[in-house]
């Protein structure tokens, strides 16, 4: 009787010791097991519940695949970032007007309202910068997870 890989059902001469299961489950190609682990993301054997000897690795950043699965969410994030950058640009371009306003302190109602609005815009700009930074970090962490792969080794 020939040995058959339990994943691909092809002939197999390898006996790999990935868990403590019986002999028939040790007959598996290393490539088949690698593919199965990366597809299923399981860290332990379904039968014996023994944890696999798995190492998580990442592709080089230059070879990352950028996955935009939910186009609606990505589009809304891009539009938000453009809005935030535009808002930040407008706020910083107004700074020269505020500097001249502060140097000639008139307590007119218009000046007080303008300063209040400008200070509010600065606070909103800071919040937008923090939020855009959080979006970028979230996007990069998600991309990092999608560009990871698992390698399995035999138990000793």
Curated annotation (Swiss-Prot):
Disulphide linkage map: none
Keyword Transcription regulation: no
Zinc finger (RING-CH-type): 1-55
Positions annotated to bind Zn(2+) 2: 19, 21, 45, 48
This enzyme's EC code(s): 2.3.2.27
Enzyme type, top EC level: transferase
Record keyword Transmembrane present: yes
Segments crossing the lipid bilayer: 74-94, 117-137
Keywords on record: Host endosome, Host Golgi apparatus, Host membrane, Host-virus interaction, Inhibition of host adaptive immune response by virus, Inhibition of host MHC class I molecule presentation by virus, Membrane, Metal-binding, Modulation of host ubiquitin pathway by viral E3 ligase, Modulation of host ubiquitin pathway by virus, Transferase, Transmembrane, Transmembrane helix, Ubl conjugation pathway, Viral immunoevasion, Zinc, Zinc-finger
Highest taxon above the source species: Viruses
Gene Ontology terms: biological process: symbiont-mediated perturbation of host ubiquitin-like protein modification; symbiont-mediated suppression of host antigen processing and presentation of peptide antigen via MHC class I
GO MF terms, alphabetically ordered: transferase activity; zinc ion binding
Lumenal side: 95-116
Chain sites annotated for binding Zn(2+) 1: 5, 8, 29, 32
Membrane topology of this protein: Multi-pass membrane protein
GO cellular component term, pick one: host cell endosome
Family to which this protein belongs: Belongs to the poxviridae LAP protein family.
Stated role: E3 ubiquitin-protein ligase which promotes ubiquitination and subsequent degradation of host MHC-I and CD4 molecules, presumably to prevent lysis of infected cells by cytotoxic T-lymphocytes and NK cell. Binds target molecules through transmembrane interaction. The result of this ubiquitination is the enhancement of the endocytosis of the target chain and the delivery to the lysosome, where it is proteolytically destroyed.
Protein name per the record: E3 ubiquitin-protein ligase LAP
Organism for this UniProt entry: Yaba monkey tumor virus (strain VR587)
Name of encoding gene: LAP
